[in-house]
Design a protein with these regions (language model features):
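Non-catalytic, polymerase-adjacent accessory regions of viral genome-replication enzymes
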Residues: 1-55
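Active-site-proximal segment of RNA-dependent polymerases
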Residues: 16, 103-160
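Reverse-transcriptase-like RNA-dependent polymerase core
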Residues: 25, 57-80, 93, 100, ...
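Short coil/turn segments at secondary-structure boundaries
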Residues: 42-46, 68-75, 108-115, 142-149, ...
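Conserved polymerase palm-domain catalytic core
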Residues: 53, 60-61, 133, 137-208
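Conserved pre-motif C helix in the palm subdomain of viral-like polymerases
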Residues: 81-111, 198-208
Length: 208
């Protein structure tokens, strides 16, 4: 789904691991990551010893001994109940570093109306395009139109990690970078009371 010119550019870039995990790149990623977050307690705590933390992360990454720390889980109600898994600042910095490398590789494959975490997109453009589509479909409010609000239940909990890794690794030439991504994907594990397990139990209970 990527044009040949872009594939050639991507292969030339090569996702060189040493450049990705370099000190300079990590500090650059930190400046991007901390935007609009500088007053958060966990960000300020990490920044108190910023150089030590970044150098330690770099050393772990370059030696391939990086291990993802446990996620902090908390509950929100907006209005439905959801359990949120939040990584540490150190790990979120590593996530941001990886995001920067993968963004251009996959952005061109997304449909136009995918708005989250994309340059030049976002919720404001999404709302504006919905309003434009409603005006067009309703002939400038001359007729009634309907919109279906829907969501994929437990989407992230149900993602097949093996298939996700296969999709990503097809676009990456550096094996060390691929191993790092696989390690981070594998860091998220569902609890015993996960969606798939509960669905199997429900189907079993409903079976005659």
């Amino acid at each position: 789904f990527l044009n040949n010119r872009y594939i050639a550019r991507m292969d030339h870039r090569g996702h060189k691991y040493e450049e990705i995990v370099s000190i300079s790149n990590l500090f650059s990623c930190w400046q991007e990551f901390r935007k609009n977050k500088a007053v958060r307690e966990d960000i300020m705590e990490f920044e108190r010893n910023l150089e030590d933390n970044v150098f330690r992360l770099h050393e772990d990454l370059i030696a391939e001994r990086y291990e993802h720390e446990p996620y902090y889980k908390f509950h929100i109600y907006d209005p439905k109940h959801r359990i949120i898994s939040k990584a540490t600042v150190r790990d979120r910095l590593a996530h941001h570093m990886i995001f920067n490398e993968l963004y251009e590789v996959f952005d061109q494959s997304f449909i136009y109306h995918s708005y989250a975490s994309r340059l030049g997109k976002g919720s404001h453009l999404g709302v504006a395009n919905v309003a434009r589509a409603l005006r067009k479909s309703s002939l400038n409010n001359a007729r009634t139109v309907y919109a279906l609000k829907c969501d994929i239940r437990k989407f992230f909990d149900s993602v097949d990690h093996r298939k996700l890794e296969q999709i990503i690794q097809k676009k990456i030439s550096d094996h060390r970078f691929a191993r790092l991504i696989s390690k981070i994907i594998g860091s998220f594990s569902k609890t015993v009371d996960n969606f798939a397990q509960r669905e199997r139990e429900r189907e079993s209970w409903l079976s005659p």
